[in-house]
Every structure is written in C-alpha cells, then in structure tokens.
C-alpha cells in the first residue's frame, strides 16, 4: 500500500488522479505489448541453436524488468458473455462488390469496385486502407445499411449481424437510464446480470441510473457496445469502436472481443487493439481489395517498404 499526495483542491485531485491513472494504464499497456513481443521471440526461436545467445539475452532481460502493476480499482471486471449461436462456416460472401456515391454537386464517385472475398466463422478481420478508401462504406454494405451499386453480399446460414458505428449512439433513447437500455438488449436477464454487464463496461453504483442524454460520447459508446455484446449475435461489424473511449474502456472492449467466439470485421486506427485481436486483414487500396492470410503483424510485414541495397 502507498499514499499519494495531491497539492490542490478536490476538483484538482479528481483531474490529477485521472491523468495519473491514464499515464499508468498507458505505461502498463506499452509494457504488456513489449513483453508479448519478447515472449513470442523466445517461443519461436528457443529451440534454434543459431539464436541461443539472443534467446538467453532476452530471457535475462525479461527477468530484470520490473512489472507495472495496476491498482485493484483499475483492474477490469470480467463479464462472462453467453456463447453466441453457431453460424454456418461461410458467414459472408462478397461477389464483385461495387459502390458509387452520388455527390452533393450531382457528380458520382466510385468508392470501390469488384471486391470479392469470403468471411468465415470465427475469423477476426481488420479492414484497413487510407482515409477515404471506402472502409466505412464497405462495412455499411456488409451490414445492410446501404445497397451496393454492383455485385452482391450473401449472408450465411444462421448468421445474426450486429453493427456499430459512430451514428449508433444517435439511436439511443435519451430518456432511458443506462440499466434500462442494457436490460432492453437482454430482456430475459435478471437485474444482477444486467448490473454485472454494466459494471464490466465501467458503469458502477449510481452510474447505471443516469439517463442516456447526460452521458458523454465515450459513455454512450460503452452503452452501445455493451448492448451489442449482450445480444445473441455471431457476426459483429464494428466501425471505429474505440473512438471516444479512454484507455481503461478500450481494455474492457478488447477483453470482451477476445472472449467473443463469433465472427468479427472491424475498422480501427488502434494498432495495439488490432495486434491483440485480428487473425486476417482485408485492405482496400485504390478501389480494390487485397486479402492477407495472417495477423496484423504479418500484414505490417507484408506492406512494409522493402529496403533496397545501395
């Protein structure tokens, strides 16, 4: 146990405590990523004589590192989500998919064309590409929020789709409380289960009785994500789910999605999030789609500029 002193009034204390928590969580997260990389290297090359010195060096390095510990109040409460219903093995097929948007000046813009691919059960896919490449548009098409201009999307057998975007928050009923909103997503659940889910998404105590209309953007995001994960959905389509979320909320969401046994495709600029989650990458570039059969680190290796010998 340790005592931390704050030189200021109570408002200053609250602000400063939050800043320190964020800094500690950021340091913890960086260290966890570094430890994972080192442990991965040791696991991959531990049996190779040619790498013996490097492996031993890294083992010693890990032994000397002082682990960052989070105080108990910052540890994430885990919620055991119900197993989603099993879908067919082929979750979503894209055949020659194209999309053209009509611009305000009545001209047209082709976003992408001829996209073809298959999303299979239990895949967790990152959808990448530069800004304006059409990532959000593709997710809207997959979720049935807009029709493709060409080609087809075929959703597989027993697939239940859940879609999250920044506009999802606008659909919440501002007069309902957090608890009532989450309860509506899981009507058969008792009050204890609902409160546990709210707590897992950082709504504790009186927070569950707040009306949605007074929540911040990040809090509304957490409500929508809690509702999505409470429902019996087995194909999640997520457009920037970590926007507006602080570090602790992102850890909560990451833990929930790592537990999730359904299928997932998402857009996110959070590389740590993608590294920790996805096992396949779809990249949209100049209206076409490339598919990378590996995790996010594999994708980064493939697209990294090649060093040309001078």
Task: State each model region's role.
Residues 1-26, 75, 81-310:
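ABC ATP-binding cassette signature C-motif
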Residues 22-40, 44-46, 51-60, 75-76, ...:
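ABC ATPase nucleotide-binding domains
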Residues 45-48, 68, 144-145:
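Generic structural signal for alpha-helix termini and adjacent loop/cap motifs
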Residues 60-63, 92:
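Generic structural signal for well-ordered, non-transmembrane alpha-helical segments
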Residues 64-73:
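Amphipathic alpha-helical coiled-coil segments
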